[in-house]
Amino acid sequence: DLKKCKQGKDFGRGFYLTSSYEQAKNFVPLSVKKQVNIGSMVEGTTEGVISVFRLHLTSDVNVYTFDSADAAWLHFVTANRRKDLFPNLASQYQKYDIIAGKIANDRTARTLQIYISGGYGEPGSDEADRIAIETLLPNRLENQFCFCNQKAIQTLEFVRGDRCELGSF
């Protein structure tokens, strides 16, 4: 049920995946911690699961890909994280079932917060965009895929769940 997915994520509400197994593995401890905090998992949980999927795209699925962490990507991520910045931008992407691009992770969160709060200048200005992007690029940004609706979810085939010990990180 996509309505249970949290709002305010990089590409909006949806089911998120990555093609990087290592990135998924590194996300497990944070994911488990969040689930413990909301009561979905018990305190003291010692392992998590990496879910592996196969994608079966069909021609009727609309996919948009941000090829790089550029101004368009930055503005879209910002619009999803703070609705009053670039207020009409998020709606321009509603026609897409899957949105792909770089991930703004915990290493980049501070840069995005500074950008959003105007620390680099007015968000959307050439100068603020340039500084934010130059600051983000050295972080070796991985990819992410947001499956925005049920049509997109139906392109996924669950392959397996790999258990991983939380202490093995």
Regions found by a protein language model. Give the residues of each.
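A short, exposed loop/beta-hairpin motif centered on an aromatic-Gly-Thr core
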Residues: 10-16
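Conserved NAD+-utilizing ADP-ribose enzyme module
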Residues: 5, 9-10, 25-26, 30-169
